[in-house]
Amino acid sequence: MPTEEHNEEVPETGELLTTGDMARLSESTLRTVRFYQEEGLIEAVARADGGHRHFHPRELRKLELALHLREAGLSIANIKQLFGL
């Protein structure tokens, strides 16, 4: 479950986050991060050797918002509408 404040530092704008970073910082799971990416709610900006996804830090904010909205009872379809997708 995401919290309002992170206990860990988020990388600066130029630094990319791994799927593991996204899961840890949003207090979710790797599976959750992959699910939200597959649904189009967050977008990986690159894939490293070995297929590892990398995300811009702004995608962390989108993930956290989506998690809060799901917790509030909104469907994925409703969240997509709110995100303009």
Model-derived segments and their meaning:
Residues 1-25, 39, 43-49, 57-85:
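Arg/Lys-rich, alpha-helical DNA-contact motif
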Residues 34, 38:
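Residue-level detection of the helix-turn-helix DNA-binding "recognition helix"
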